[in-house]
Amino acid sequence: MAAKERVGVVVSNKMHKTIVVAIENRSAHPRYGKIVVKTKKYKVHDEENKCNEGDRVRIRETRPLSRTKRWELSEIIGSKATL
């Protein structure tokens, strides 16, 4: 089974080797049809501390690394300066 992958934006990098990534999920309301945006935050392992706030990143699922950390950084898609 392939590991899950997500694309999101780094909202915090204040922890050592850990970043917080916010991922938006857009879906239509079942009755009214309005587009509803839901945001979920994931703690992600960043081994080299190379991400900054505002970077767009791809993350992938991994084994549990701590109580709340189950994702690792796959790649940096774009930095805040280039977005």
UniProtKB/Swiss-Prot annotation:
Gene Ontology biological-process entries: translation
Output the Gene3D superfamilies linked to this UniProt entry: Nucleic acid-binding proteins
Key word RNA-binding present: yes
Which ranges does the record mark as transmembrane? none
Question: What CDD domains does the database record attribute to this sequence?
Answer: Ribosomal_uS17
Q: Enumerate the UniProt keywords alphabetically.
A: Ribonucleoprotein, Ribosomal protein, RNA-binding, rRNA-binding
CC annotations in GO: cytosolic small ribosomal subunit
Could you confirm whether the keyword Transmembrane appears in this record? no
Q: Which GO terms describe its molecular function?
A: rRNA binding; structural constituent of ribosome
* Top-level taxon of the source organism: Bacteria
Fetch the Pfam families from UniProt. Answer: Ribosomal_S17
Subunit organization:
Part of the 30S ribosomal subunit.
HAMAP family xref list: Ribosomal_uS17_B (MF_01345_B)
Function of the molecule: One of the primary rRNA binding proteins, it binds specifically to the 5'-end of 16S ribosomal RNA.
Annotated family: Belongs to the universal ribosomal protein uS17 family.
Which NCBIfam families does the record associate with it? PRK05610.1 (NF004123), uS17_bact (TIGR03635)
**Official protein name in the record:** Small ribosomal subunit protein uS17
**What gene name is given for the protein in this entry?**
rpsQ
